[in-house]
Regions:
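A short, conserved alpha-helix in the catalytic core of glycosyltransferases
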Residues: 162-213
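Active-site-adjacent helix/loop segment of glycosyltransferases
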Residues: 7, 206-312
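A conserved acidic beta->alpha catalytic loop
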Residues: 23, 38-47, 66, 96
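Conserved donor NDP-sugar-binding/catalytic core segment of glycosyltransferases
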Residues: 96-137
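Glycine-rich, basic loop-to-helix element that forms the pyrophosphate-binding segment
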Residues: 63-84
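A recurrent flexible, glycine/aromatic-enriched loop bordering the glycosyltransferase active site
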Residues: 129-130, 150-171, 188, 193, ...
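Short, acidic, metal-binding catalytic loop of nucleotide-sugar glycosyltransferases
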Residues: 22-31
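Short beta-strand-to-loop acidic/aromatic patch adjacent to the donor-nucleotide binding site
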Residues: 86-97
Length: 336
C-alpha cells in the first residue's frame, strides 16, 4: 500500500481544525498518519492539539514558532514525510472536512500514467456548489479554480488537469526530491499552482478525480487579516509568471498579464485596497531580483517538456470573473 502523511496546518483556528481532524481519522483508507503543523498560534490551539495528539495514535504535532504561511507550513510537513519515508503527502486545509473515501480515491488516482499529483472534488461547505476541481493557468497569466461556483451536479469527469488545489491534494514525496519544495516566497496563494507548474515542466502529470470529495469553508483563515489576499495576489502573480512560463510564451502571456494587472490594480484602488496592492507589487519586484529570476534559470534548464506542450495545457481564455477585460480579449482572440 501507499503510505500517506496527511498534513493539516493550524493558525489560531482550532475549532475548524478539530472538525477537520475528526473527518480525517475516520478515513476508510488506513495506511496514513496525520501531522498537524501549528503555525505560531497565539490562542489555545497548542493546548487543545496536545490533548488530541494523546487521544489518537495516528495524529502527531509539529510546532512552528512563527507563522510561516501555507508554503512554509506545508514544507514542515513535507520534510517530516521525507525524513520518515512516506510514499506520499496530502495537504488538507484545516477549514475543510473530508468524505470517508476521500483519501482512498486520491491514492487510486496515482495509478494514472505518469501521475505525481492527484486532486479531488472540493465543494463549498454546504455541498451544493463547487469550490475547486483543480486550477487553470491562463494565457493572461492568471491562475484560477476550475468550476468554482458551478452546481455540484455539473462536476466534470475525472481526467488530467493543469494544477492541483493545495488545500486537498496528494503528492508523491519523490516529486519534491526532484523539483524542490514549496516556494516560501509565496507564503500563501498560488504556491500550489507554482508547484504544479514546476511539476508539468518536469514532465509529470496531475490528475483530477471527482470521487475524492471534501467540503471547504473558503477563506476562514485569510479573512482574519485585512488586505492579506490583495497583498499576496499582487506579489505572487508576477512570481508565478517569472519562474515558470517558458521563453516562447513570455511575450504573449506577458502583454496580456500587464493589461490585466493594471486593471485589477485599478479595481483594488477603487475598493480601498490600493495600499496592500501597491505593497504586493513592490514585494514582487524585490523577489524578482533576489530570488525568482535565479530560480527561473534552474527550473527552465531542467525542463523536460516542450513549449508547445505547455501551450496546449494552459487555458486560452480569461477567468469567468474578469468581465472588465472582455473588451481587451477581442484584440488578442477576435472574440468578445
Amino acid at each position: 500500500m501507499t503510505s500517506v502523511l496527511i498534513v493539516v496546518l493550524n493558525w489560531n483556528g482550532i475549532k475548524d481544525t478539530e472538525k477537520c481532524l475528526d473527518s480525517l481519522v475516520h478515513q476508510t483508507y488506513r495506511d496514513f498518519k496525520i501531522l498537524v503543523v501549528d503555525n505560531g498560534s497565539i490562542d489555545d490551539s497548542l493546548e487543545r492539539l496536545r490533548k488530541i495528539e494523546k487521544k489518537y495514535d495516528k495524529i502527531s504535532l509539529a510546532i512552528n514558532k512563527h507563522n510561516k504561511g501555507f508554503s512554509g507550513g506545508a514544507n514542515t510537513g513535507i520534510k517530516y514525510a521525507l525524513k520518515r519515508g512516506f510514499d506520499a503527502v496530502t495537504l488538507f486545509n484545516n477549514d475543510a472536512e473530508a468524505d470517508e473515501n476521500w483519501l482512498a480515491e486520491l491514492v487510486k488516482g496515482l495509478k494514472e500514467p505518469n501521475t505525481s499529483i492527484v486532486t479531488g472534488l472540493l465543494l463549498h461547505e454546504d455541498g451544493k456548489t463547487i469550490d475547486s476541481t483543480g486550477d487553470y493557468y491562463s494565457t493572461w497569466g492568471m491562475p484560477f479554480p476550475r468550476n468554482r461556483g458551478d452546481n455540484t451536479d455539473k462536476a466534470p469527469e475525472s481526467g488530467f488537469v493543469f494544477s492541483g488545489s493545495g488545500g486537498a491534494s496528494l503528492y508523491k514525496t519523490a516529486l519534491f526530491k526532484e523539483i524542490g519544495l514549496f516556494d516560501e516566497s509565496f507564503f500563501a496563494y498560488y504556491e500550489d499552482v507554482d508547484v504544479s507548474f514546476r511539476t508539468q515542466l518536469a514532465g509529470h502529470k496531475i490528475y483530477f478525480t471527482n470521487k475524492a470529495i471534501a467540503y471547504h469553508k473558503q477563506g476562514a483563515t485569510s479573512k482574519k487579516i485585512p488586505g492579506f489576499t490583495v497583498y499576496q495576489t499582487f506579489k505572487n502573480i508576477p512570481l508565478l509568471y517569472t519562474k515558470n512560463v517558458p521563453a516562447g510564451l513570455l511575450l504573449p502571456i506577458g502583454v496580456r498579464l500587464f493589461l490585466l494587472y493594471v486593471l485589477i490594480f485599478a479595481n483594488a484602488v477603487k475598493k480601498g485596497s490600493g495600499v496592500p496592492a501597491f505593497k504586493g507589487w513592490l514585494a514582487s519586484i524585490r523577489y524578482f531580483w533576489t530570488k525568482s529570476l535565479w530560480l527561473r534559470f534552474s527550473i527552465q534548464s531542467n525542463r523536460k517538456v516542450s513549449t508547445s506542450y505547455i501551450n496546449s495545457i494552459i487555458l486560452h481564455d480569461l477567468s469567468p470573473d474578469q468581465t472588465g477585460m472582455r473588451k481587451f480579449r477581442k484584440i488578442f482572440t477576435g472574440k468578445a
